[in-house]
Amino acid sequence: MQPGEGYHYDSGPNNAVHPHQLPAGSRLNQYLANNNRQGPSFGPGTPINVNAPVFVPKHQQPQPAQVAAPPPMVNQFAQLSIHDVPHQMIPFGQINGPPTFGPGQHMNHRASHHHQSPQMAQQPPTLQQSAYDRYQLENRGGTTYFYTEPTEAGPDDEQYTEAEAPDGSILVNTPGAFGYNAPLPISHMARFRGKANANLQTQFISPEIRMELINRQLAYDTKADSAIIGDIPHSVEHFSNLVPLEIAGIQSQTTYKAFSCRDGNYYCLRRIHGNRIQHPGKQTHLVEQWKKLVHGNVVPLREVLINCRAFDDSSLIFAYDYYPLAGTLMEKHFDTKSGTFFDPNNGFRISSPMNVSMPISGTGAHETLIWSYIIQIAAALRAIHSSGLACRTLDLNKIITYGNKIMISFCGIQDVLDPDPTTIQQQQNEDLNMFGNLIVALATGRANGWRKDLYQQLKKFIEDTYSMDLRNVIGFLHNNSTRKTINEIMPMIGGRFFTVMENMQAKTDVLEAELSREMENGRLFRLVAKMNTVLERVEHGTDDAWSETGDRFMLKLFRDYVFHQVTDQGKAWLDMAHIVQCLNKLDCGSQEKIEMVSRSGDTQIIIDYATLKRCLDKSFRDLLGTNMMLHR
């Protein structure tokens, strides 16, 4: 290597004053020359990694005292492999040990302060000697360099011997987790992200979705304050932690949030006060049909409690799925407060970003929004009517908004309270009439705008404001002279259905992009968990075959290089981009070389990510093999 090539190495942070030139015949010089085309150029003052300064240790951290070995570890990390390579059980005889050290060649690192036996301090040079031959040592200027012989083989060409399970043991091959490196964020999702926060959102979930999920979680965690809301039973059957979802008052029906000890989920309980069922079989025969109905725009009914005595009366309770921070159409479009959940513990009102108040001042809702409601409600009615049922509760207080989704709630209550002797066709026609009333209320901005006396006054406003298609839908739903079905309004919806579908697909793309980002975060977590599982194991402190030299010493230095960087002033250098970049390069086995320095400053190692990856995979396989041998 010539001096002008830009390579400059010192003897460590503690005793480096002048650069030491490597002789032309040095094996370290040959190693660096052969990899010069693949690695970056390292010059004076230039860090080895583009975004990271060279690790400069400032102190030695004392090693904690040795403790008793933990209970036998259950092999729960079989899925930590980042390759589609079956794990192997390596017997003790095949475990590769650390490289040997001659006289005067020692590693002064934290592992030397373990409470070790004298036999472990002086390791026999002949122990697994064939496994150490791939390491080359060269001392220049008081610094010991470790490197491997230059080779043309790829990082994954190293061969491992397939081990056979001994008697009494079972060898289990698992496919592991596939290595994936998808570009983040997804290219076609860039138009859904603001430019100001584009860089921050490439690695983390978007703030809007984060706040929405946090608010929903807060709604799940709220508790009831008996001093404010009065006396509420501690439990109702298997439901506990009841919290009212409506303002307390004199009313015949109340709604609660409750936790079920059966499955650990939260449910919405609709209580009918003082209602005793005289003929349970006759009045509840449609409940099972409602339980079987599954549709995205219908809140599913889960359970009905008949003649419940928990409230000191004979109450009828319906249990539905709970959607936190969901608000009704009445709250969203006609009330001053919408989409809020009152927490009696702290007095906060938690508002969902998707449920923003939309006050109406003499005008109706936008036609695009009304068509979105029409399409979703029509889809729900189509599913209900196809099941041989009728909604019977289609009004502004029974339709909830959850995000951008419309859902019909409290279905089945009228079938139990007031069984209708009329035919199902007549009940379904009544659903369509209520559907038309709902559209009129949204279009006119008046909750009772569907009344005949008011509708005649507002009819001119609807004709001047909205399209012919919307007026035709209202006229069709209000027409009682002919028998009609929900399917007949599909031609009136026309191409607007595709607009709603495109918006839903766009929202799905956004959520999938966020999910893929969190999946990448999970991959890096598994990699960190895998590395920390191998390092500094207390139970192997007296095991010569598990001394933290060789592969595990490389991993310890790499951990310091990634997480324990310091600035020139000795302050902690906290850079998430550096951590994510290093872990990704380790995961893919990059050929880029980095310089790692021991905490004492006596040892510097130049190594590529591909070698570090092999060290991690091999050390983890050794740990799995040792664990299986110990717990046969």
Curated annotation (Swiss-Prot):
Its main location: cytoplasm. Highly expressed in germ cells. It comes from the Eukaryota. The keyword Amino-acid biosynthesis does not apply. One of its GO terms (biological process) is mRNA processing. Residues 1-22, 99-127 are annotated as: Disordered. Keywords: ATP-binding, Coiled coil, Cytoplasm, mRNA processing, Nucleotide-binding. Residues 495-533 form a coiled coil. Residues 534-632 are annotated as: Knob domain. The keyword Cytoplasm applies. One of its GO terms (molecular function) is poly(A) binding. Residues 223-494 are annotated as: Pseudokinase domain. ATP binds at residues 270, 321-328, 397-398. Residues 107-116 have a biased composition (Basic residues). Residues 117-127 have a biased composition (Polar residues). It is found in: Cytoplasm, P-body. GO terms for cellular component: P-body; PAN complex. Regulatory subunit of the poly(A)-nuclease (PAN) deadenylation complex, one of two cytoplasmic mRNA deadenylases involved in general and miRNA-mediated mRNA turnover. PAN specifically shortens poly(A) tails of RNA and the activity is stimulated by poly(A)-binding protein (PABP). PAN deadenylation is followed by rapid degradation of the shortened mRNA tails by the CCR4-NOT complex. PANTHER family: DEADENYLATION COMPLEX SUBUNIT PAN3, PAN2-PAN3 DEADENYLATION COMPLEX SUBUNIT PAN3. Homodimer. Forms a heterotrimer with a catalytic subunit PAN2 to form the poly(A)-nuclease (PAN) deadenylation complex. Interacts (via PAM-2 motif) with poly(A)-binding protein (via PABC domain), conferring substrate specificity of the enzyme complex. Interacts with the GW182 family protein ain-1. The N-terminal zinc finger binds to poly(A) RNA. Contains a pseudokinase domain. The protein kinase domain is predicted to be catalytically inactive because some of the residues important for catalytic activity are substituted and it lacks the equivalent of the binding site for a peptide substrate. However, it has retained an ATP-binding site and ATP-binding is required for mRNA degradation, stimulating the activity of the PAN2 nuclease in vitro. HAMAP family: PAN3 (MF_03181). Belongs to the protein kinase superfamily. PAN3 family. This is PAN2-PAN3 deadenylation complex subunit PAN3. It comes from Caenorhabditis elegans. The lineage of its organism: Eukaryota, Metazoa, Ecdysozoa, Nematoda, Chromadorea.
